[in-house]
């Protein structure tokens, strides 16, 4: 009689590989229920669980203690919280120790969950997580099969318009979108500014598609000599806060961009197809002097699929883009180089990679 843990032999690149059938089944089941993890994490964020643990003496609390701090009226709250937190421990989002004769579980933060606690600037990835889990985004997945079979953009098929049109007409979704970008930019830029020194000799910097201006505000704060222009659609910049040294300018990057000796684009090119990217980059080329440069911050997808954490993150983002943008996608180093050359730039320098954002300099 066969074992419940039956194994079979596979070959990978000519080498025998033993794969445990139980492990394969478990992984398939986990994929079938994968939505549970982000939803449980978001629930913990909404309840403020990570902040509560972060503020606790010793940095550890039981589910009962968390429920008390939350002033939960539901008598089953401690049990419900404990079940959610146990799941997060199994994915290393939290860690756990057992205390006392009753074996009470005490939960603490890990290096992952610290990103769901607002930092000194109030930024956390919890606000970023709210975007892909927003009802508007979630509904877009219902349009993927039809888009594959018949064409079109999943988001457009479901909502009847492009995501940026939708955001301009739906203030709630627009707030969620820009809050996500604000928080991601705040967290990423702090670390980028520690490693990337390419702004030191810039005198006039234009952030194309800069949203509410948080990216430029952080750069201008570190480099106050820079004349900073935050450039985005008029309805976007009209809601932007005032920052020292930052001027907000409304316009359309497909028509023209303000002049500067350096132009910055963070998470912009991956929103558009190659033809649209070339239009944007050619406008940037025209707006920079002979010794100018365009600084692109974007994920870079490996030439062949990988299983590293960064490659998984990039692939997740790439497929997310597929649901909302017609030609938007993550690109390889080779594809970015081809875009740079195609727009007239002489070359590209891959300066560094921080927070899975590759900082690329396109030189004239």
Curated annotation (Swiss-Prot):
Belongs to the class I-like SAM-binding methyltransferase superfamily. Cation-independent O-methyltransferase family. COMT subfamily. One of its GO terms (biological process) is methylation. This is Anthranilate N-methyltransferase. Its EC number is 2.1.1.111. CDD domains: AdoMet_MTases. Expressed in leaves, flowers, stems and roots. Detected in the vascular tissues in stems, in the rhizodermis or the endodermis of roots, in the inside of carpels, in the central vascular bundles of the syncarp ovary and in the secretory oil glands located around the outer ovary wall. It comes from Ruta graveolens. Optimum pH is 7.5. S-adenosyl-L-methionine binds at residues 209, 232, 253, 266. Involved in the biosynthesis of acridine alkaloids. N-methyltransferase with a strict substrate specificity for anthranilate. No activity with anthranilic acid methyl ester, anthraniloyl CoA, 3- or 4-amino-benzoic acid, salicylic acid, catechol, eugenol, caffeic acid, quercetin, theobromin, theophyllin, putrescine and nicotinic acid among others. It comes from the Eukaryota. The active site is at residue 270. The lineage of its organism: Eukaryota, Viridiplantae, Streptophyta, Embryophyta, Tracheophyta. Inhibited by Ca(2+), Co(2+), Fe(2+), Fe(3+), Cu(2+) or Zn(2+). No effect of Mg(2+). Signal peptide: none annotated. It is an enzyme of class 2 (transferase). Optimum temperature is 37 degrees Celsius. Residues 1-20 are annotated as: Disordered. Keywords: Methyltransferase, S-adenosyl-L-methionine, Transferase. Homodimer. It catalyses: anthranilate + S-adenosyl-L-methionine = N-methylanthranilate + S-adenosyl-L-homocysteine + H(+). GO terms for molecular function: anthranilate N-methyltransferase activity; O-methyltransferase activity; protein dimerization activity. Induction: Up-regulated by yeast elicitor treatment.
């Amino acid at each position: 009689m066969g074992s419940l843990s039956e194994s079979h032999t596979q070959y990978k690149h000519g080498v025998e590989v033993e794969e445990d059938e139980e492990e394969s089944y478990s992984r398939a089941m986990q994929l079938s229920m994968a939505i549970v993890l982000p939803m449980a994490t978001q629930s913990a964020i909404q309840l403020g669980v990570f902040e509560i643990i972060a503020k606790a003496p010793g940095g550890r609390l039981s589910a009962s203690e968390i429920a008390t701090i939350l002033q939960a009226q539901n008598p089953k709250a401690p049990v419900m919280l404990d079940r959610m937190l146990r799941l997060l421990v199994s994915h290393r989002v939290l860690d756990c120790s057992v205390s006392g004769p009753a074996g009470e579980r005490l939960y603490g933060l890990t290096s992952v969950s610290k990103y769901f606690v607002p930092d000194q600037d109030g930024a956390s990835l919890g606000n970023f997580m709210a975007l892909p889990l927003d009802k508007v985004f979630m509904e877009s997945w219902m349009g993927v099969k039809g888009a594959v079979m018949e064409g079109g953009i999943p988001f457009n098929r479901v909502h009847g318009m492009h995501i940026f049109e939708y955001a301009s007409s739906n203030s709630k979704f627009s707030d969620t979108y820009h809050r996500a970008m604000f928080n991601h930019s705040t967290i990423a830029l702090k670390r980028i500014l520690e490693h990337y020194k390419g702004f030191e000799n810039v005198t006039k910097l234009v952030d194309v598609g800069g949203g509410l201006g948080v990216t430029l505000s952080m750069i201008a704060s570190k480099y106050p000599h820079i004349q900073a222009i935050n450039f985005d659609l008029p309805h976007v910049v009209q809601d932007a806060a005032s920052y020292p040294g930052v001027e907000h300018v409304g316009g359309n990057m497909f028509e023209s961009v303000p002049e500067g000796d350096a132009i910055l684009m963070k998470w912009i090119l991956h929103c558009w197809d190659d033809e649209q990217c070339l239009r944007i980059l050619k406008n940037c080329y025209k707006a920079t002097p002979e010794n100018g440069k365009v600084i692109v911050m974007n994920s870079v997808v490996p030439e062949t699929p990988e299983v590293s954490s960064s490659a998984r993150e990039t692939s997740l983002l790439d497929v997310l883009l597929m649901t909302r943008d017609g030609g938007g996608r993550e690109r390889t180093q080779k594809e970015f180089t081809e875009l740079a050359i195609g727009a007239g730039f002489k070359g590209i320098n891959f300066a560094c990679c921080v927070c899975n954002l590759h900082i690329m300099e396109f030189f004239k």
